[in-house]
Design a protein with these regions (language model features):
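SAM/dcSAM-binding transferase cores
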Residues: 76-136
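Residue-level signal for inorganic ion chemistry
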Residues: 4, 67, 114
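Short glycine-/small-residue-rich Rossmann-like dinucleotide-binding loops
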Residues: 42-43, 118
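Short strand-turn motif at the edge of the Rossmann-like AdoMet-binding core
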Residues: 22, 43, 66-70
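Conserved beta-strand segments of alpha/beta enzyme cores
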Residues: 14-16, 62, 88-91
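Short alpha-helix immediately C-terminal to the canonical SAM-binding loop
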Residues: 1-2, 71, 75
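Helix-to-beta-strand junctions that scaffold the AdoMet/dcAdoMet cofactor pocket
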Residues: 57-59
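Conserved SAM/SAH cofactor-binding pocket of Class I
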Residues: 1-42, 48-53
């Protein structure tokens, strides 16, 4: 959080940083369905990321997940899980990452933008062990 705190201060962003496990924070009334946007990197399959992130997003907000080249197929495969969690089908945007000095070309990523159109059912997010064992 130190880096994020410094970055937000330097950019003069009016944000609140919260350090919590997503599966716990997503059940807290003070955090549940309170945020306009939640983001995630490609650290898990989309149904898992959606279960962690969509409970934080209020209706009318968005969940944005960064994925690799297979992002479009992953979005299609996860549509049922996303809908169960209150999300609309993902809109897929292709972006190019800046070229680092040690690379010759920019890398492509997919931003999966999921609009929150309904409340996430109270059963979600489930405990992390159950999410890992039985993804939606």
């Amino acid at each position: 959080l130190v880096f994020l705190r410094e970055l937000c201060a330097a950019l003069e962003l009016p944000v609140t940083l919260i350090h919590a496990r997503a599966e716990e924070g997503g059940r807290q009334p003070a955090l549940r369905e309170q945020f306009d946007v939640a983001t995630a990197r490609a650290v898990a399959a989309l149904p898992v990321l959606a279960e962690y992130c969509l409970p934080f997003v209020k209706q009318g907000g968005r969940f944005i997940a960064m994925k690799g080249p297979e992002g479009e197929a992953e979005a299609a495969a996860a549509a049922k899980a996303v809908a169960r969690l209150g999300g609309a089908p993902a809109k897929v945007h292709t972006v190019l990452l800046p070229v680092p000095p040690d690379r010759e070309a920019a890398e492509e990523r997919r931003l999966l933008v999921i609009d929150k159109i309904a409340a996430t059912p109270p059963a979600y997010p489930r405990p992390s062990a159950k999410i890992a064992r039985q993804p939606l």
